[in-house]
Amino acid sequence: MSDTRPQIKTWIEGIHAYVPGKATGAQGQALIKLSANENPLGCSPKALEALDAPGNPATYPDPDAKALRAKLAEVHGLDAGRIVCGTGSDELLNLAAQAFAGPGDEVLFSTYSFSVYDIAARRCGATPVEAPDADYAADVDALLAAVTDKTRVVFVANPNNPTGSFLPRDEIARLHAGLPQDVLFVLDQAYAEYLTPEEDDGGFALAAAHENVLVTRTFSKAYGLAGERIGWATGAPHFIDALNRVRGPFNVTNSGQAAALAGVDDQNFIDRTRDHNTRELTRFTDAMAALGNHGIRPLPSKANFALVLFEGTLAAETALSALADAGYAVRHLPGQGLPHGLRITIGTAEDMDRIARTIAEAAEAAQ
């Protein structure tokens, strides 16, 4: 008997649903959540004050987020007319693929990159194509070699999630220069606020000067506003027009716009966040590197997390269980081809000391 139900499109059937970071253990116990790359310092006091301010939830938000776009343009030296806001940068990444790729097209990204890129490609019926990494970092030569006449979108996260790797300005420029002009280059800068000004990868300048570059950012990481779901992108006017055509008309809430506006106005908080992250990331990766004789290897990271590889007698699953017993949820990544890796968000100094100690004890026990 034939199936008469509405049939899901074949390319949608190929999607593996995004799996968010966990906050509970196997028995349902609450854990300290270091699995989603949230800010351990919370958000700016100014943003919190904006969230607490009375408002009218019966009214629709500004559909164009004009005040927020103007403030972003002021802080980053951009043209507000070349900025669009979204429900997190995830929405904008998906819409970029939807607007510029479809069945018969290819969407290109590195093997160990943000899992949303694969989903974004499949959602619009395009074919996801993975270029091999070089020791868990994006390889410009491999990406360029994977470009075909079917390539329509290239996604690069910089810094990269889940590995923390980073392509410097000259490599980003080389990648862009090697792409055909009719290929959209999406530079996902979700973790850019964790970089120093000297580490700027030149994305904004590329987006301002070229017709095929879109840069996305988010308020979910350094700004500590993950619960409000706010992202933004900048690029050529025809990109902004395309994204405005396909996005929801009221896609950023009143509270989200107010909190983001206040957060952008408090760059001192971003500086404190960066300083905390740099200090604790360095301490933690040093502690993990000291366990190299146990086959434990932290990858270099410019983000707010460390990807720790377990290549010796201590398995990642065993370390994951030990950390849960110690009260922590971190991200195990077998679904992204990293069954031997744990992505660990940088938390407080106390958190990182306890995690390092737990892993060291588990490594000794596994000998």
UniProtKB/Swiss-Prot annotation:
Broad class of enzyme this protein falls into: transferase
Reaction(s) this enzyme catalyzes, per UniProt: L-histidinol phosphate + 2-oxoglutarate = 3-(imidazol-4-yl)-2-oxopropyl phosphate + L-glutamate
Domain of life: Bacteria
Keyword Amino-acid biosynthesis tagged: yes
Record CDD domains: AAT_like
Cofactor(s) named in the record: pyridoxal 5'-phosphate
NCBIfam families noted in UniProt: hisC
Protein name as annotated: Histidinol-phosphate aminotransferase
